[in-house]
Amino acid sequence: MKIKELRLLNITIKQNDQILFQGKTEEIPPNLKEMEYEKIYFEGVDVIVEIN
């Protein structure tokens, strides 16, 4: 599933423990929206998405 298909408000996208994006799903940069995620989980009220 691609990241752009997520419909949640607060999201953090990480790659190798480095944060690539943190904010609202609607504001994700186009290059990240097309990436597929490896792992997704909740941390508090935020959704954490890990990519390769």
Positions of PLM-derived features:
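Short, structural beta-strand-to-alpha-helix junction motif
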Residues: 1-4, 24
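Detector for the mature cores of small, proteolytically processed
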Residues: 9, 15-52
